[in-house]
A protein has these predicted regions:
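Nucleic acid-binding interface residues in structured DNA/RNA-binding domains
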Residues: 2-110
Length: 110
């Protein structure tokens, strides 16, 4: 039986996974935020695809959400993503993270 490699397929994927690991517990970042942290600010969709298929225990994929605080998809189920966020003190209501602007990381200047 072949062992599946846990190494990222390319440099951008590696940068995305590194950026996602930097998101602190109890905070969230959007796919666009992570794309910018990984050096490709217009690659939000690519980040979404990477997060959707990640499934690695060392990457907190559940902290990466869609624009406007929508929780988006998850390699597990949406209910599992909600539970992981709730375990970190975040509240999801109506498919969105409550107080999104306050818990978004990194904080945006107003």
């Amino acid at each position: 039986m072949k062992r599946r490699s846990t190494a990222p397929a390319d440099k951008f994927t590696a940068r995305v996974l590194t950026a996602a690991r930097r998101i602190p517990p109890g905070r969230v970042a959007t796919y666009g935020d992570v794309a910018a942290m990984a050096g490709r600010p217009r690659a939000a969709r690519a980040v979404g695809n990477i997060m959707r298929t990640c499934g690695r225990a060392d990457v907190p994929c559940h902290r990466v959400i869609a624009a406007g605080g929508r929780i988006g998809g998850y390699v597990g189920r949406e209910t599992f993503k909600r539970a992981l966020l709730a375990a970190e003190g975040l509240i999801v209501s109506g498919g969105r993270v409550r107080d999104f602007d306050r818990v978004r990381w990194p904080q945006r200047k107003r």
